């Protein structure tokens, strides 16, 4: 009888804990997007096989594709300070990569080749002619691979702060595979993700990695990255 009572108590506590974490996750989700900073009047959607891809199109002239860094908090909003200037001489396409920003975030394993396929397909089906590309951070690696795969799709390529080859040469280790499995867990994994991508961690990212002078960052930029994550 005592054993049965312990099982019932454990079951009730587990259920209550799960419900509490679930509602906490919902609260964090709602709080992150309440300012709606990623809304865009120029919204367009490219329906790809793995999900809908959000992009904007501005200006006239030779085509130019802007690709943001590959971070969970990244989005096409990274280019907001220069895309209007570029649009004076180019037709500027700004993407939110699959799994980022306003694009779909399917529960799949994201690989370099997945993004190679996305970029090549987008240029062929949406832009339709050789395109100049500006890529930030990790995105530069799969742009180079995409160019090697389909060279006729590309004009000039510019990479901003490309990731060094030593980092690109790494493969997933036991720790990263374990973390991936943890994040993929329902409810608990979502809470872990929210912890890793909390606003304080986004602020730290801006301070230590994104700005030479951290005082130049704006609260709105931090909020936009937090919303994207």
Residue positions per predicted region:
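A short loop-to-beta-strand scaffold at the N-terminal edge of the catalytic core in hydrolase folds
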Residues: 47-58
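Conserved catalytic-core motifs of eukaryotic protein kinase domains, centered on the activation segment
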Residues: 76-78, 103-109, 168-171
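Active-site loop/oxyanion-hole signature of alpha/beta-hydrolase fold enzymes
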Residues: 94-134
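Conserved hydrolase catalytic core segment
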Residues: 128-172
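Conserved alpha/beta-hydrolase catalytic His-Asp/Glu region
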Residues: 169, 194-229
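A catalytic-pocket lid/entrance helix-loop region that shapes and gates access to the active site
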Residues: 169-188
């Amino acid at each position: 009888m005592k054993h049965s009572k312990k099982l019932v108590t454990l079951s009730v506590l587990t259920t209550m804990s799960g419900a509490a974490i679930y509602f906490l996750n919902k609260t964090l989700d709602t709080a992150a997007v309440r300012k709606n900073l990623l809304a865009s009047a120029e919204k367009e959607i490219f329906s790809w096989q793995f999900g809908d891809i959000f992009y904007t199109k501005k200006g006239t002239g030779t085509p130019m594709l802007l690709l943001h860094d590959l971070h969970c908090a990244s989005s096409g909003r990274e280019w907001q300070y220069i895309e209007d200037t570029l649009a004076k001489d180019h037709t500027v396409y700004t993407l939110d990569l699959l799994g980022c920003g306003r694009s779909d975030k399917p529960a799949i394993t994201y690989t370099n080749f997945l993004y190679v396929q996305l970029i090549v397909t987008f240029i062929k089906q949406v832009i339709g002619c050789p395109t100049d590309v500006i890529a930030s951070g990790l995105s530069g690696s799969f742009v180079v691979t995409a160019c090697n795969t389909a060279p006729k799709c590309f004009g000039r390529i510019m990479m901003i702060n490309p990731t060094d080859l030593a980092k690109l040469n790494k493969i997933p280790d036991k720790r990263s595979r374990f973390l991936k499995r943890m994040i993929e867990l329902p409810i608990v994994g979502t809470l872990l993700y929210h912890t890793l991508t909390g606003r304080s961690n986004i602020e730290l990212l801006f301070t230590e990695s994104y700005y030479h002078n951290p005082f130049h960052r704006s609260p709105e930029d931090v909020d936009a990255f937090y919303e994207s994550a």
